[in-house]
Curated annotation (Swiss-Prot):
Key word Cell inner membrane present: yes
InterPro entries associated with the record: Capsule_polysaccharide_synth
One of the GO biological process terms: polysaccharide biosynthetic process
Name this polypeptide is given: Capsule polysaccharide modification protein LipA
Localization (cell): Cell inner membrane
Function description: Involved in the phospholipid modification of the capsular polysaccharide, a strong requirement for its translocation to the cell surface.
Phylogenetic classification of the source organism: Bacteria, Pseudomonadati, Pseudomonadota, Betaproteobacteria, Neisseriales
GO CC term (a single one): plasma membrane
Keyword vocabulary terms for this entry: Cell inner membrane, Cell membrane, Membrane, Polysaccharide transport, Sugar transport, Transport
Topology within the bilayer: Peripheral membrane protein
Length: 704
C-alpha cells in the first residue's frame, strides 16, 4: 500500500458521506453503463428519465449532451459535467476499457476556458491547501513518473535503440499534434492556425535542434486527421506516429511545445520547459511559457494567479478527480489507481505481442484466456506445432506452453528461434483442486523458465535475486502474510479441519506428500523423488521425532500418482493425516521436511522451520535448511522479500466473476469468502456432475 493511501481513502469516504443524495437524470445510456457509476456518484440516485429530477448529468461538452443541457436549462436544474480522469485505465475507452477515474464539474468543464470550471476554482483556492494534501500530491507525482503512468497505459516504452535515447543526440524539441474534433482545441481558444504558429515558432526558436512531432497513430492510417502532418516535410523535422508511452517519450526530450494537449501537463511533471499556444487548464498559472493572447485577460479577470506545479497537480488529481478501487469496484483513491495501473501496465508489457498457445485442451484454454486479456497481447490457440509451422509469424511472436512445456513444443521453439513463455497455477489458487476442474484465481507467466525448474533460472528466481524491494512492498507483504495466516489460506484450501492433534513432547515433523510425476519433482528434486523415499529419509535423520505424513490431496482424490500404502506409511510415520487440510497439520508441527512442496513456503509464512530435500523456489535464500546447494541464489532474503517476490511481483490474479485483473490482497479476500462459504464441504471428492457443470460454466464464460 502507498504511504498516504489509507488516509486519503478515509478523507474521500468522509466527504462523500456528507453529501445529500438527490435524484439525477442521466439521459445518456453510455454514461449509465459505466461500471460502478453509483460509487463514483454517491450523491445521486440515477434515473434514465427526468421525472422528479433534481440534477442532470452529461458527458463534458459532447454534442450528445445538448438534450441533457436543454432539459437542465428548461427545468432550472443544475447540470453536472463528467469526463474521464487524468489517470483513466490500462486500455482505450473505445476498446471497452472502463474508467477508474472521472472528473466531476458542477460549474463548467476543465478544458473549456471560455468560462470558469470547478478545477479552476480549486486551483485558485490552492494557496490555502493543507500541507498533508501537498505531501500526498508530491508522493503521487513521484509514483506516476516512476511507473510511467498516463491517462491510458497500454503503449510501449520508447525503445532502447530509438534515436531519442542516443547519448550523442542533438538538442531535441517535441511538438505535440492533436486530432481534428478534439474539443479541448475548440474550447481552448485554438484552431488550425494555432498549430501552424506553434510549429513555425518552434523551428525559429530552436534553429540547431532536432524537431520531433508527436501525432496520433490513427492519423497516419487515415482514421483521423491531424494538424501538423503536412508541415513536417522539412529538414531536421521527424514524425513520431507510433504509439509510445507519453512519460517515457517526454523524459527523453529537452523542450516541449503544445496547444492544449494533456501531454503538456505531463511534460511539466517530467520537469521539461513547456510552451503553450492554446488555453489548456494548466496555462496561465506561471508554470509554463504561455503565448495565447487571452492569457492576460484571464489574469486580469482574476481567473489566473501564481500557483506552483504541486498545487496544480493536487487540485486536478486529488481534489477534482474521483476514483474507484479497480480491485474491488468500491470507492478508491488516486493511490489505489496508481498501484493498480502500475501492476497491470507491467503485465501488459510482459505479454506484449503475439502469443501462440500450442496443443492446449479446451478446459485449459478457458482457464488461461482471461489472464491474457490485456490490450497489447494477441493470444492465439493452435492445436499442434505442425500447424504452427505453416503460420507466418510476426516479429513479436512467442510460444506459450503450460508448465515446463512439452518436449515437442520446447524443441520447436528452439529450432525456429521463437521465444518461449511458460505458465502455471499461482501459489494462492482456489477453493478446490485443479484436478477437480476448479479454475484458478492466479497464474504465473515466465519468460525465462518456470519457478519449479531448478535446472535453469526462472523469472521468479531473477526477481528474488535482483528486485529492489521498497517500503511499499514491505507493507503489502506483511499485510498479505497476515491475511493468509490468520484466515488459514493455502493454495487449494481443501480438506477437513478435523485432525487428531499429537500428544507428545517430541519434535513434531510434518512430511507433505507430493504427486510423484509432478514436474516440480522431476526438475527440482534429483536425489529423492518418491514419497516413500522421503518419508524413510526423514525417519533415518530424525529417529526420535514424531512424524506426521500428509498425502497430497490430488493423490487422495485418486486423480494423481504417489500413493503410499498404510503399512508402508506406518513403518516410518507416527500418524497419517489423509483428510485433514494442510494448514491444520502445520499448526501442530515444529518442522516441515519436504522435497519441493509448496507447503514449505506456507510453513515459512507461519514461522516454521523448513528442511528441503530438493530445490524448491524458496530454498537457497537463507530461510531454509537445504540438503542440496544452489549457488545461483546468492542473495540472503528476509521473509517479507520472499513473500513480495512470490505473491506480488511474479503471479497475475483475476476476479473469478468479472475476469478483471486484481491484486494479491483482493485475491486473498475472495478466497477467504469462498472458504467460509464452503466450511462444511472439504472439497476433495468433487462429484462427476459438479466437475462437468463447473467445466461448462468456465468454457461458457471464456467464449462470451
Amino acid at each position: 500500500m502507498f504511504l498516504f493511501s489509507d488516509g486519503l481513502q478515509s478523507i474521500n469516504n468522509n466527504n462523500r458521506r456528507k453529501r445529500i443524495v438527490k435524484n439525477a437524470y442521466i439521459p445518456s445510456r453510455g454514461i449509465r453503463k459505466i461500471p460502478h457509476l453509483s460509487t463514483l456518484l454517491p450523491e445521486f440516485h440515477i434515473y434514465k428519465d427526468g421525472k422528479g429530477a433534481e440534477a442532470v448529468v452529461g458527458w463534458g461538452l459532447r454534442p450528445t449532451t445538448h438534450k441533457a443541457r436543454a432539459f437542465a436549462t428548461e427545468h432550472q436544474l443544475p447540470f453536472i459535467a463528467l469526463e474521464d480522469g487524468f489517470l483513466r485505465s490500462l486500455g482505450l475507452g473505445v476498446s471497452g476499457y472502463p474508467p477508474y477515474s472521472i472528473v466531476y464539474d458542477d460549474i463548467g468543464i476543465y478544458y473549456d476556458t471560455t468560462r470558469p470550471s470547478r478545477l479552476e476554482q480549486l486551483i485558485l483556492a490552492a494557496d490555502t491547501m493543507p500541507s498533508e494534501t501537498l505531501a500526498q500530491a508530491r508522493q503521487a507525482m513521484d509514483f506516476i513518473l516512476q511507473h510511467h503512468l498516463s491517462k491510458y497505459n497500454h503503449a510501449p516504452e520508447l525503445s532502447d535503440d530509438h534515436p531519442l535515447r542516443s547519448p550523442s543526440k542533438s538538442e531535441t524539441v517535441l511538438i505535440i499534434d492533436q486530432t481534428f474534433g478534439d474539443m479541448a482545441i475548440q474550447y481552448g481558444g485554438a484552431d488550425a492556425s494555432t498549430f501552424e504558429l506553434m510549429f513555425q515558432t518552434a523551428l525559429n526558436e530552436n534553429p540547431q535542434a532536432d524537431i520531433w512531432v508527436k501525432t496520433h497513430p490513427d492519423v497516419l492510417c487515415g482514421k483521423k486527421q491531424g494538424y501538423l502532418t503536412q508541415l513536417v516535410q522539412q529538414h531536421r523535422v521527424h514524425l513520431l506516429a507510433e504509439d509510445i508511452n507519453p512519460i517515457s517519450l517526454l523524459q527523453n526530450v529537452d523542450k516541449v511545445y503544445c496547444v492544449t494537449s494533456q501531454m503538456g501537463f505531463e511534460a511539466l511533471l517530467c520537469g521539461k520547459p513547456l510552451t503553450t499556444f492554446g488555453l489548456p487548464w494548466y496555462a496561465g498559472w506561471g508554470v509554463s511559457d504561455d503565448r495565447h493572447p487571452k492569457i492576460g485577460s484571464l489574469i486580469q479577470t482574476q481567473r489566473r494567479a501564481p500557483r506552483n506545479l504541486l498545487q496544480l497537480f493536487a487540485a486536478a488529481y486529488l481534489q477534482y478527480s474521483r476514483y474507484l478501487n479497480p480491485n474491488t469496484g468500491e470507492a478508491g483513491s488516486l493511490f489505489d489507481v496508481i498501484d493498480y495501473l502500475a501492476t497491470v501496465k507491467r503485465k501488459n508489457d510482459k505479454l506484449r505481442g503475439e502469443l501462440y498457445c500450442v496443443g492446449m485442451s479446451l478446459w485449459k484454454r478457458a482457464v488461461a484466456k482471461p489472464f491474457f486479456n490485456v490490450p497489447s497481447c494477441r493470444l492465439k490457440f493452435i492445436s499442434s506445432t505442425q500447424k504452427l509451422a505453416r503460420v507466418k509469424l510476426s516479429d513479436d511472436a512467442r510460444i506459450l506452453a503450460w508448465g515446463n512445456g512439452k518436449e515437442a513444443i520446447v524443441r520447436f521453439a528452439e529450432q525456429h528461434h521463437i521465444p518461449l513463455l511458460r505458465m502455471e497455477d499461482g501459489f494462492i489458487r482456489s477453493v478446490g483442486l485443479g484436478s477437480n476442474l476448479v479454475p484458478p484465481l492466479s497464474l504465473v507467466t515466465d519468460d525465462m523458465s518456470i519457478y519449479f525448474n531448478a535446472e535453469t533460472p526462472s523469472r521468479l528466481e531473477y526477481i528474488l535475486q535482483n528486485q529492489n524491494f521498497d517500503d511499499q512492498d514491505f507493507q503489502t507483504a506483511l499485510k498479505l502474510q497476515k491475511m493468509l495466516t490468520e484466515n488459514h489460506i493455502s493454495k487449494y484450501n481443501v480438506g477437513s479441519s478435523d485432525f487428531t492433534a499429537p500428544s507428545t513432547d517430541k519434535t513434531v515433523i510434518l512430511v507433505p506428500g507430493q504427486v510423484e510425476d509432478d514436474a516440480s519433482i522431476r526438475y527440482g528434486s534429483p536425489q529423492i523423488y518418491r514419497n516413500l523415499d522421503l518419508l524413510r529419509t526423514v525417519r533415518e535423520r530424525n529417529p526420535n521425532a514424531y512424524i506426521i505424513y500428509k498425502p497430497h490431496p490430488d493423490v487422495v482424490s485418486g486423480n494423481r500418482i504417489g500413493h503410499i500404502s498404510p503399512d508402508d506409511a506406518a513403518r516410518y510415520a507416527d500418524q497419517t493425516a489423509e483428510q485433514a487440510d494442510i494448514l491444520t497439520c502445520l499448526q501442530y508441527a515444529d518442522e516441515i521436511h519436504t522435497m519441493t512442496s509448496l507447503t514449505g513456503f506456507e510453513a515459512l509464512l507461519r514461522g516454521k522451520k523448513v528442511s528441503c530435500y530438493g530445490l524448491p523456489f524458496y530454498a537457497g535464500w537463507g530461510l531454509t535448511q537445504d540438503l542440496l546447494p544452489i549457488p545461483r541464489r546468492s542473495r540472503r532474503l528476509e521473509l517479507w522479500q520472499l513473500v513480495a517476490g512470490t505473491l506480488i511481483y511474479y503471479p497475475d490474479y483475476i476476479h473469478p466473476k468479472t475476469h478483471q485483473a486484481i491484486n494479491a490482497e483482493t485475491a486473498a479476500q475472495i478466497l477467504i469468502r469462498q472458504k467460509n462459504m464452503q466450511k462444511n464441504n472439504n472439497g476433495l471428492h468433487r462429484g462427476c456432475f459438479a466437475k462437468k457443470l463447473g467445466k461448462i460454466k468456465q468454457l461458457y464464460r471464456s467464449f462470451k
